[in-house]
Each structure stands twice: as C-alpha cells, then as structure tokens.
Amino acid sequence: MKSFVKPERDSLLRTVRIVFTDPDATDDSSSSSDEWLPKPRKVKRFVHEITFLPQVSESSQDRSNAVKTPRRKSTRQFKYPVGVRPRPSGKFAAEILNPFTKTKKWLGTYETPAEAEKAYVDKKVEYDALASSGSAVSSSVVTVTSQCLRSPTSASVSCVSADDLSKEKTSLNKDVAASGDSTTKEVFTTFDFSDVKIPDLRFLAAEEDSMVSNANGAELDFDCFLTDSNILLDDYSLLENDINFSRFENSLPSELPDCDFTEMEFQLDDFKFAYTDHLTTPPLGLV
C-alpha cells in the first residue's frame, strides 16, 4: 500500500467550506404516481470551498533583525580623588587623616576637585616628612645610647650628642602636636583671660594668723590629773583590796591529789588514745 504524501504546498493550504440552503428550490425527480404520498419539502443545499495560503509567521531571524529598543545605560557615580568629597553647595571639600592624632583634619572648601586634591597632596607630603624625620631621630637616639653603653671612655661625648638628639626629638614632637591641634591652639590664643574674675582668698590668711597667735598664747595645764597630795591614783591597790585570790593564803601552795593517768583513755569517735603505750615511766606524785 502506497502512502500518499501531499506536496509541501498542499500542506500549507487552508480550506474554508461555506454551506448554505435555498428554500425556494424547485427541482423534483418524482413521478405523478407518487403524488398521493406525503413528501418532505425539498431544500437545495450549496457548498462553496475557498482555499488560501496561511499568513507567514515571523522567523527567529526576522525577530533578531528587528529594531531593538536601546537599553538605558546605568549611570556610574563619579569617583572623586582621595580626601575630596562634593558639598551640597556645588563646591568640593578636602580633608586628611592626621597620622599622629588619628583624627581627620579639615583642609578647606575649593571650587574644583583639582584644587581640593592639590591641598590634600601638599598636606600629605608634610605629614610624611614629619613622620620620616621623627623615625630618623628615634633610630639615631637608640644607636648613640648603645654606643654610650659600650664605650665608657667616650661616654661624655656620646651622652651629650644623645641629649641633643632627644631635645631635637622633643621639639619635633611639639611641632607635630602643634600642627595636629592648631584649632585648639587658636581657641586658647584668642581667649581673653583678663575678663576672668579671680576670687579673693585673703580671709584664709587672716584666719591662719589668728590660729597661730592663739596657739602661741595657750598654756597646757597637767595639774588636773594629780590629786591634792601630787600622787596619781594613790588610793587604788590591786592586790590588797579589790581582787581576792583564794587558796593562796600566807603565800603557801595547796596540796594536790595524786593522779594516775596510765589507765585513762580518750575516745574520739572511732579512735581511742591510750596513754599506757606512750608512758614508759610511772607517774610521779605531785606535791
């Protein structure tokens, strides 16, 4: 059995059938003898076919070649130089981190980013120079001190040079602190101390003088501790009147009974302690 394969064109064709009826049709093939039988009303039916090609769909290539709407490019934020940031007024501020005080130092506001960057670079060079000179002074002080310890003959010369270097380092540290705290220095220099009211403390000196004069004129009286006969606590006798010690009449000791501790045992919980195992000599009678 052969399989019928439709051509490619026929497979692409679309057919539309239009069917309708004509109620006024008059065609009749019956004879006159059949007139006595009831017959249904004949209706003429019409069928029309319309064939057409389907609409060609867009291919993927056509879609790729179509005009694409341009995508909106993301606007990247402009990167300003280090130490420069924009101000709401449209100008640019410059600031730098002080390596000695670990705080930010304000350098000012400028019209362009280039001016602000230049101020930052100049201040950074200044800080780098101060840091390098400070490290050089520290290393030289360490070497001079070690040489001073090793060679005692040249101790005076080395120590003098070490003192000079330490003074130089102290002055350098003062300069660094002054440069780092310029704002604080300006506040103290502009402050007027003449308006400060100093309290009058002269009344303290007057009270101190009066206390000293009273102490010099006072005399200590120790007579109140003595009786009329100038004997302190003459009427008090500890042994004769107040305390009575029994069994010591006529300053003689009393007789004590003889005690034998060899048969005595001390019992503490589950342990017994007998003195018979430890005493090798018989006890002596106590007189």
Swiss-Prot record:
GO terms assigned for molecular function: DNA-binding transcription factor activity; transcription cis-regulatory region binding
Top-rank taxon: Eukaryota
Membrane spanning stretches: none
SUPFAM superfamilies assigned: DNA-binding domain
Record keywords, A-Z: Activator, DNA-binding, Ethylene signaling pathway, Nucleus, Transcription, Transcription regulation
Segments of the chain annotated as binding DNA: 80-140
GO biological process: ethylene-activated signaling pathway; pollen development
GO cellular component: nucleus
Compartments, as annotated in UniProt: Nucleus
PROSITE patterns: AP2_ERF
InterPro entries: AP2/ERF-transcript_factor, AP2/ERF_dom, AP2/ERF_dom_sf, AP2/ERF_ERF_subfamily, DNA-bd_dom_sf
Entry similarity comment: Belongs to the AP2/ERF transcription factor family. ERF subfamily.
Function text: Probably acts as a transcriptional activator. Binds to the GCC-box pathogenesis-related promoter element. May be involved in the regulation of gene expression by stress factors and by components of stress signal transduction pathways.
Protein name stated in the entry: Ethylene-responsive transcription factor ERF116
Organism: Arabidopsis thaliana
Biological classification of the source: Eukaryota, Viridiplantae, Streptophyta, Embryophyta, Tracheophyta
